[in-house]
């Protein structure tokens, strides 16, 4: 990426764009905002003037019941009742405006403000997402993403539907795709993180379905009562217009209309279902609601699958950790005993190689560097101090040698306090070919004025050869390594190298950590059960059971922690 100061300033300005207070909507939809207490209209889109045949300024201050009929307002009140702030919810359909045209009304509440979004009602019957959900369930985890792309295309009619997963560096990769031939395939291509800036990702978490009916639409500005203390927060408005940079991005891609459906796993944005069309395309509120439900169901399947894999992996690693502890327990010379448990210790963590540096000696297993490389890793770790964990996925960070194939990433944890003993974990180099949708080092172009950036104009596949790095170390990897360290320190507590440093070490820290993690998994399971909605009575019984188990685990963690 360019290091030009003007380019960086423009790029920073793009990343800081306050798109949640953009102050305009996409027509032909209309936005009305009124105060929950008092019912006074405090904001309205400019095109409301045409719908209600009055000046938009004349709408401000009017009681909402004089503008919207009571039956539709009752549906709005029901839709927002007892709900926390969140995305607009389809309230119903009613006659609106001077000529009583049929409009779908969606609504959400934000504090004392109620947002009503009105869209012309379609005469077509809304899709049945039930068959799509069954199709996802019948394909199993391996076929889920392709089935999701196909079912979204069937429900929405978009030319290209891609399932796009975010990776550790913020970039995204297209893992599945459904095409009808009007747009080119992007399957297998990767997009740089800068394509979706942080503030946009935050909004994807808040509002799970977003549609742009026409990238060339003229936004309708929102007028608001000057007494409102701040610009109107439009985070949850489905009609909210889009950053001009994003619209230009879509036009450069040859896309005339788009829609995105968020995939959320463990409370984080896992990815998107990105839908593109070769010509403008309206998606009615009923269809968006069906696609929202389908996206949430797919998210639940992904979340459950990830949780199941995590539990299975950690159970296997815990068994290996227990094996290490059992074999070292009671040995007169635990250091000598370590030679026989290094393979089990390696299996207890997510690494390709392990080195224990004890009393100036190296004990190693798996894929590790030569002696000189181990010394280089130790120097790198010592320079970062013994008070924290040090890790890197880049071989050049710690190893000056050219050959880092067998040991590229390193995670270093000090053993004991006040001594030079270390636990080193290594990961092999991951050489790979990445196909980018356009050059990742040229994600933007500076406009002629030099004041703003525009998106790139080419999305042609560009090949990059990646080497010199391993799979990155995640927080979970560090936690597993720390647990192994506890086991090793406990076993070595009576040896000369660590004497006096670990007299208080016992099994409690590991037990407390595992109890807290079991509790966290139960909370996540409860969230998945909420999503499954098996029936109120059954769900309440499940929650009571989970709460009881969680209390027991919490007591264990509190006692042992």
Language-model region placement:
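GAF sensory/regulatory domain recognition
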Residues: 166-222, 357-379, 387
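Active-site-adjacent "gating/activation" loops or surface patches in catalytic cores
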Residues: 208-254
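Conserved oxyanion/phosphate-binding beta-strand-loop segments in alpha/beta enzyme cores
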Residues: 108-125, 206-224
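Terminal helices and disordered tails flanking the catalytic cores of nucleotide-processing hydrolases
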Residues: 1-15, 321-334, 340-459, 472
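Regulatory loop-to-helix N-cap segments in sensory/regulatory domains
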Residues: 237-241, 276-292, 424-426, 430-480, ...
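Bateman (tandem CBS) regulatory domains
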Residues: 128-134, 228-232, 317-325
């Amino acid at each position: 990426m360019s290091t030009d100061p003007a380019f960086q300033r423009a790029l920073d300005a793009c990343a800081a764009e306050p798109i949640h207070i953009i102050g305009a909507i996409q027509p032909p939809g209309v936005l009305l905002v009124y105060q929950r207490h008092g019912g006074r209209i405090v904001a309205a889109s400019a095109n409301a003037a045409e719908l209600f045949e009055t000046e938009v300024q004349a709408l401000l201050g009017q009681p909402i019941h004089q503008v919207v009929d009571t039956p539709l307002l009752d549906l709005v009140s029901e839709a927002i009742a007892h709900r926390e702030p969140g995305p607009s919810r389809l309230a119903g359909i009613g006659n609106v405006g001077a000529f009583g045209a049929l409009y779908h009304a969606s609504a959400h509440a934000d504090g004392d403000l109620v947002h009503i979004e009105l869209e012309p009602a379609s005469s077509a019957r809304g899709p049945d997402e039930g068959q799509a959900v069954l199709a996802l369930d019948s394909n199993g985890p391996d076929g889920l993403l392709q089935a999701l792309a196909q079912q979204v295309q069937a429900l929405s009619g978009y030319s290209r539907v891609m399932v796009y997963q975010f990776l550790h560096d913020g970039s995204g990769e297209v893992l599945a795709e459904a095409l009808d031939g009007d747009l080119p395939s992007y399957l297998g291509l990767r997009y740089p993180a800068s394509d979706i800036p942080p503030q946009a990702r935050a909004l994807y978490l808040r509002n799970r379905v977003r549609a742009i009916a026409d990238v060339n639409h003229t936004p309708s500005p929102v007028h608001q009562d000057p007494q409102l203390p701040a610009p109107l927060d439009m985070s949850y408005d489905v009609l909210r217009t889009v950053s001009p940079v994003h619209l230009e991005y879509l036009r450069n891609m040859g896309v005339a209309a788009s829609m995105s459906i968020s995939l959320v796993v463990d409370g984080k944005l896992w990815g998107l279902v990105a839908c593109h069309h070769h010509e403008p395309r309206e998606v009615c509120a009923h269809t968006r609601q069906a696609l929202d439900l389908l996206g949430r169901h797919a998210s639940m399947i992904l979340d459950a699958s990830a949780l199941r894999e995590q539990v299975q992996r950690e159970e296997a690693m815990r068994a290996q950790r227990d094996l290490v502890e059992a074999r070292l327990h009671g040995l007169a010379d635990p250091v000598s005993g370590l030679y026989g448990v290094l393979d089990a210790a390696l299996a207890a963590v997510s690494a390709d190689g392990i080195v224990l540096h004890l009393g100036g000696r190296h004990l190693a297993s798996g894929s590790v560097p030569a002696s000189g490389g181990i010394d280089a890793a130790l120097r790198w770790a010592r320079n970062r101090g013994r008070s924290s964990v040090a890790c890197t996925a880049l071989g050049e960070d710690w190893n000056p040698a050219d050959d880092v194939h067998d040991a590229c990433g390193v995670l270093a944890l000090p053993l004991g306090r006040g001594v030079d003993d270390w636990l080193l974990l290594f990961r092999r180099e991951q050489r790979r070919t990445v196909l980018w949708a356009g050059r990742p080092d040229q994600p933007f172009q500076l406009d002629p004025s030099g004041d703003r950036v525009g998106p790139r104009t080419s999305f042609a596949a560009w090949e990059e050869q990646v080497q010199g790095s391993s799979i990155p170390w995640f927080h979970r990897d560090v936690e597993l390594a720390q647990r192994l360290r506890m086991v090793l320190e406990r076993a070595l507590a009576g040896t000369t190298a660590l004497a006096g440093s670990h007299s208080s070490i016992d099994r409690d820290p590991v037990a407390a950590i595992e109890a807290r993690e079991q509790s966290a998994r139960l909370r996540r399971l409860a969230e998945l059960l909420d999503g499954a909605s098996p029936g109120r009575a059954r769900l309440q019984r499940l929650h009571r059971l989970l709460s009881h188990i969680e209390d027991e685990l919490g007591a264990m963690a509190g006692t042992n922690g």
